[in-house]
Amino acid sequence: MKRYTLGASVRMDGSDLFGVDKKYRFLPIYSISGLWRISNEAFLKPANQWMDNLALRLSYGLQGNIDKNTSPFLLGNYSNQTVIDKNETIITIGSAPNDKLRWEKTASYNAGIDLSVLKSAINLSIDYYYRRGSDLIGYKDLPLENGFSSQAINWASMENKGVEINLQTRNITCLLYTSPSPRDPK
């Protein structure tokens, strides 16, 4: 097994669901990751009698999200309502248009360690993750003299972090002792 592994990915995504300004339509999405297999280092060779794998993992990535319920344009909802005993078709405008809407972004960080011992009878993985969402689309109240009650804008953010622990064991897979079967009295 190799000691070091690096990985990377880059792409450009675009959408016409965002603002009219072209600079908001595209988002570079990328990730980078690395792994150091510590168990293959010379200073750990004596431990390889009982330790099968010890590895440290790190990664970072940026991804985008499209909120398909928003639009940079003025949108209306058609509905039928009864007005003075007549059925009338009306258009209700949801929110003010925003030509500066852009991608929601999520940056993800991850650090982890993997350990396998006793011919992979015990496997342990511990991961720390941190995710930060920015430019999340939400509705902000507007002054009522605008004629609109709210507008979709990129203003929210959110953080998520935690630790994940995964322990797997392979229990005894063979029978160590079997009792003799009773003999047939014939």
Residue ranges of each PLM-predicted region?
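Extracellular/periplasmic, surface-exposed regions of secreted and cell-surface proteins
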Residues: M1-S179
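A short, hydrophobic C-terminal helix/tail in secreted or cell-surface proteins
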Residues: P180-K186
